[in-house]
Amino acid sequence: MFLQRLFQARSRRSVSWLVLTSQVVSLLFSPFYLPVIAFAALLVFSYLNMLPLLTKALLLVLVYCFTIALPHFFIFLYRKFNGWTRHQLGRRERRYVPYAVSIASYASLFYILVSIHVPRFALAIIAGALSIQVVCALVNSRLKVSTHAAASGGVVGSLMAFALIFSFDPTGWLCLTVLLSGMVCTARFVLRQHTLRELGWGVAIGVVCGFCCVIFI
């Protein structure tokens, strides 16, 4: 009896740690943050690092405002207005307004970056994120696609495309991004936010959109 209780207590502790870890991974690799991280990587590892520090900072602040701050603010207002929790907002039929807010914000950012003549390969990051949002919104009526999985897949697809454009060996980075994508999908599955089918479709949409936008823009 004592051993059984001890085993149950350890099992509950293990499950709680697993859920907590999944929540942290899900938060750190939110689809809202990935465009900012990708843009920052371009400012460091491409010829854009020759820009003045103030210019790079202003570009990052601009991207942050339109991909994180504004969407989060308006989605928060929408959720509070309806009295929903984050989990309740995640229901498939309630995701259209958050999608519309994100798409409008990303489209505005894309227009601004085009207006200030940002290089095409940098525009491709925002275009990829925008196209992922659009495709996920279109298929939302039939399938609750995971935007976390789609965003992580977009990073993988974009990396493959940049490897072709700049002719570098992406093996190490590709392994890392695939591993991170797997971590994100596992976290969403553990939290019971999505099924394996929804996660798989999300990754597939992300890879295709990320790759095509970088190649063709």
What residue spans do the PLM features occupy?
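C-terminal halves and exits of single transmembrane alpha-helices
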Residues: 99-117, 139-141
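The first (N-terminal) embedded transmembrane alpha-helix
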Residues: 25-46
